[in-house]
Regions:
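Helix-to-loop junctions at the C-terminal end of transmembrane segments
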Residues: 1-2, 91, 208-221, 305-306
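Structural signature of the two symmetry-related core transmembrane helices
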Residues: 4-19, 223-238
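Hydrophobic core of transmembrane alpha-helices in multi-pass small-molecule transporters
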Residues: 15-17, 24-47, 247-261
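Cytoplasmic helix-loop-helix junction between adjacent transmembrane helices
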Residues: 32-76
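Transmembrane alpha-helix termini and helix-breaking/packing motifs in multi-pass membrane transporters
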Residues: 81-103, 181, 185-186, 296-316
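C-terminal membrane-cytosol helix-exit motif in multi-pass small-molecule transporters
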Residues: 87, 113-136, 325-333
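Juxtamembrane intracellular "pre-TM" segments in multi-pass secondary transporters
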Residues: 128-168, 185-189
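Short amphipathic helix-loop junctions that connect adjacent transmembrane helices
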Residues: 177-193
Length: 343
C-alpha cells in the first residue's frame, strides 16, 4: 500500500543519514545514498514524490489538481529553503566554535537521519483514503500482462519518462550542491552566504509555483511548462557570464523565480493524462527516469569542476540541453490535453 511504502522510504532515509554520519567507505556511501533517497540537489529523488502525487490526484477533482500541486510545490520549496539556510548557518557556527568541518557536516546528516524517523511517524498517520482501493475514480485492476502497472497509459508514460530523463540529466550538471560549490570556487562565498543565497532562491521558486497554477488556467499546462522553463534556461546559461558575486546572485534568483513554475504543471499534467488506476505506476516510472538521468550527469560535472578552467561549462551544457527538452516536450504533447482543458 501507499502508506507502507512512504513509511519504508522514511526508514531508508534515516538509515542513509546514519551511514553518512558514521562511515567513510565510498562504496557503502554510494549504496546508502542510492537507496536512502539522499539528494545532492535538496529536491525529492526517492519514492515519496510519485506516491504523494498519485495520492493527491486520487483525492482531488481535476479542476483543483494544478492549484493543489502548486501549494504542494510551494511547501516543498520553502522547506528546502529553510533547510539550506539552517545547514549553512549551523555548519559555519559549528566550525567557528572550533569544530572540524567534517564533524560539522556529520552533525547535519545526523539531523537528516532524525528527520527521517519523524517523517516515518507522520506517514503512519496518513488516511486510508489515499490507497488505490478507495475513492470514486477507482478503475479495474491492471492485468498481469501490463508493464509494471501500466496499461493504456504505457506509450504516454514512456515518452514522458524519456523527456523527463533528459531534463534531469541536464539539471544534474548544476544541482544546488554543485551550484553552491561553483559560487565558492568562483567568488569564495562562505557557507553562511551560500545558505542565504539558496534560501532566497528556494523561496522564490516556491512562490512562483502559485503563479504557475494561475497561468496554467489561462494558457494550459504544456504552454505554461514551456514559456516559463525556456527563459529560465537562458538565465542559467548567463550565470557564469556574470563578473561579480552580486550580479551572479541576481541572475540566479531571477532564474529561480521562474524555473520551478513547470514543476506543479508537469506533475499535474502527468497525473492528468494517465489512467487514474495507473497514476502510482506512472509517477514511479517518471520518477525513476528523472532520478536515473540526474544520477549520470554529476559524474561528468564532477570532472569539469575538478578543472578550474572548466567550471563554467556545466552551466552551458545544462542550459542548452534544457532548451532542447522544452522544445521537444512542446511539439510532442501540445495536442494531448488534460481532461480539464478539453472542449
Amino acid at each position: 500500500g501507499r502508506r507502507r511504502m512512504l513509511v519504508a522510504g522514511a526508514v531508508l532515509m534515516a538509515l542513509a543519514g546514519l551511514a553518512f554520519a558514521f562511515t567513510s567507505n565510498l562504496l557503502f556511501l554510494v549504496i546508502a545514498g542510492t537507496i536512502g533517497v539522499i539528494s545532492p540537489s535538496g529536491n525529492e529523488v526517492g519514492p515519496f514524490l510519485s506516491i504523494e502525487q498519485a495520492s493527491l490526484s486520487h483525492l482531488i477533482p481535476p479542476g483543483s489538481r494544478t492549484e493543489v500541486f502548486a501549494w504542494y510545490t510551494l511547501t516543498g520549496s520553502l522547506a528546502t529553503a529553510l533547510g539550506a539556510l539552517f545547514a549553512g548557518v549551523v555548519t559555519q557556527a559549528l566550525q567557528r566554535s572550533s569544530m572540524a568541518p567534517v564533524a560539522s557536516y556529520r552533525a547535519i546528516v545526523l539531523l537528516y537521519a532524525f528527520l527521517g524517523i519523524v517523517l516515518g511517524m507522520v506517514f503512519t498517520q496518513v488516511s486510508a483514503l489515499v490507497e488505490v482501493n478507495h475513492g470514486p475514480d477507482q478503475l479495474q485492476q491492471t492485468s498481469t500482462g501490463n508493464l509494471l502497472g501500466l496499461g493504456k497509459s504505457r506509450n504516454v508514460v514512456l515518452k514522458l519518462s524519456g523527456l523527463f530523463a533528459l531534463d534531469s540529466f541536464a539539471g544534474g550538471f548544476v544541482v544546488q550542491s554543485f551550484a553552491a560549490y561553483w559560487f565558492y570556487l568562483r567568488f569564495g562565498a562562505e557557507p553562511k552566504t551560500l545558505g542565504a543565497i539558496f534560501f532566497a532562491a528556494n523561496v522564490f521558486a516556491g512562490i512562483s509555483a502559485l503563479l504557475a497554477s494561475r497561468l496554467a488556467i489561462r494558457i494550459g499546462l504544456i504552454r505554461t511548462m514551456v514559456v516559463t522553463h525556456l527563459p529560465s534556461n537562458l538565465l542559467l546559461i548567463a550565470i557564469p557570464l556574470m563578473p561579480t558575486l552580486p550580479l551572479a546572485v541576481v541572475v540566479l534568483l531571477l532564474r529561480f523565480s521562474i524555473s520551478q513554475m513547470d514543476v506543479p504543471t508537469r506533475q499535474s499534467y502527468t497525473m492528468a493524462v494517465v489512467e487514474p488506476g495507473e497514476r502510482s505506476a506512472a509517477g514511479g516510472f517518471t520518477g525513476v527516469a528523472r532520478t536515473t538521468g540526474a544520477a549520470i550527469s554529476p559524474l561528468l560535472a564532477g570532472f569539469l569542476f575538478a578543472h578550474p578552467a572548466l567550471i563554467n561549462i556545466p552551466f552551458y551544457i545544462a542550459g542548452t540541453l534544457k532548451v532542447v527538452y522544452d522544445l521537444l516536450i512542446y511539439f510532442s504533447f501540445r495536442k494531448l490535453r488534460p481532461p480539464e482543458e478539453r472542449p
